[in-house]
From Swiss-Prot:
Name this polypeptide is given: Phospho-N-acetylmuramoyl-pentapeptide-transferase
Reactions accelerated catalytically: UDP-N-acetyl-alpha-D-muramoyl-L-alanyl-gamma-D-glutamyl-meso-2,6-diaminopimeloyl-D-alanyl-D-alanine + di-trans,octa-cis-undecaprenyl phosphate = di-trans,octa-cis-undecaprenyl diphospho-N-acetyl-alpha-D-muramoyl-L-alanyl-D-glutamyl-meso-2,6-diaminopimeloyl-D-alanyl-D-alanine + UMP
Main subcellular localisation: membrane
Lineage of the species this protein comes from: Bacteria, Bacillati, Bacillota, Bacilli, Bacillales
EC number of the protein: 2.7.8.13
Signal peptide: none
Gene name as annotated: mraY
Catalytic class of the enzyme: transferase
Family matches, as CDD domains: GT_MraY
Organism name: Listeria innocua serovar 6a (strain ATCC BAA-680 / CLIP 11262)
Length: 324
């Protein structure tokens, strides 16, 4: 019965997305909600200018509908259900505001860094408050052991770092057609299997709703992309995957399951630090690191497939660590 629920959750999110996206694309085109390409980006990306963005509105809607339907049908409505719901919805809303400013008000950078950060912090604090008053364990598991450390009030610092950090990490990674969509399918599949193995059906249902929605969206987001998810999607997915890792108490495995997100973010941090320390020298041709490979002659599709492969290896290892 539980496996049937997961398959059904996946299927409904997938079907709604596959039906909804083709209907949404002409609407976005009519409103001229097209992606602007930053001048400092790779020149080969200029052809993407005007591609409809904010496609995440469809797959987030599909995910939330499927998630809630099968959470109630299965009787698996819990505090975790509402934590995941508000995380996906609120990070998505923050991203939507950022996208709206970019495409409607024609401010290419969207929200300022300070505004976006304050929004992320506010959502993370709300997550902590719901988590805290739901009597979840505020502990951190030591990797490859069964030992957990009680963080006490320091747990809120960890929550802020984890949710804000990974929402930004996924946002940084979303620069190539299909890259984040495919990585999300891989990562949430891994966490879905882990949650199912740990008998956390509420979290597993959420994960497979996301897998269904993202796989449906990938059909239109793969190279050459007909639509982009925008910050609406990348912030929502990043915040959600961090939340899932906390709820299944496998936080550190996210560093392996989401290894590409970590590498992409690290490349930006290293580039900025080295640039400032050396007075203008660079480690990479351009960051995030996927652009480094593009400028080195790799096709966009080759970069995406390679990064998917690395993400898949990390996900398989992580699932094996938990199960075996």
């Amino acid at each position: 019965m539980s496996l049937y629920m997961l398959v059904s959750t996946f299927a409904v999110a997938f079907i709604i997305t596959v039906i909804g996206v083709p209907l949404f694309i002409p609407f976005l085109v009519k409103l001229k909600f097209g992606q602007s390409i930053r001048d400092e980006g790779p020149k080969m990306h200029e052809k993407k200018s005007g591609t409809p963005t904010m496609g995440a509105v469809i797959f987030i809607t599909a995910m939330l509908i499927s998630f809630l339907i099968f959470s109630f049908i299965s009787g698996e409505v819990s505090a975790a259900t509402w934590l995941l719901f508000i995380t996906l919805a609120l990070f998505g809303a923050l991203g939507f505001l950022d996208d709206y400013i970019k495409v409607v008000q024609k401010r290419n950078l969207g929200l300022t860094s300070k505004q976006k950060f304050l929004g992320q912090v506010a959502i993370s604090i709300l997550f902590y408050l719901v988590y805290h008053f739901s009597d979840f364990a505020e502990t951190l598991k030591i990797p490859f052991t069964n030992t957990e450390i009680d963080l006490g009030w320091f747990f809120i610092i960890f929550i802020l770092f984890w949710l804000v950090g990974f929402s930004n990490a996924v946002n940084l990674t979303d620069g190539l057609d299909g890259l984040v969509s495919g990585l999300s399918v891989i990562a949430f599949s891994a966490f879905g299997v882990i949650a199912f193995y740990q008998e956390q059906m509420d979290v597993a249902i959420f994960c497979f709703a996301i897998v269904g929605g993202m796989l449906g969206f990938l059909l239109f987001n793969k190279n050459p992309a007909k639509i982009f998810m925008g910050d609406t999607g990348s912030l929502a997915l990043g915040g959600s995957i961090a939340a899932v890792s906390i709820l299944v108490h496998q936080e550190w495995l996210l560093l392996l399951i989401g290894i590409i997100f970590v590498i992409e973010t690290a490349s930006v941090i290293l580039q900025v630090f080295y640039f400032k320390a050396t007075g203008g020298k660079r480690i990479f041709r351009m960051t995030p690191i996927h652009h480094h490979f593009e400028l080195g002659g790799w096709s966009e599709w080759r970069v995406v497939l390679t990064f998917w492969g690395i993400g898949l290896i990390g996900a398989i290892i992580s699932v094996c660590v938990v199960i075996f």
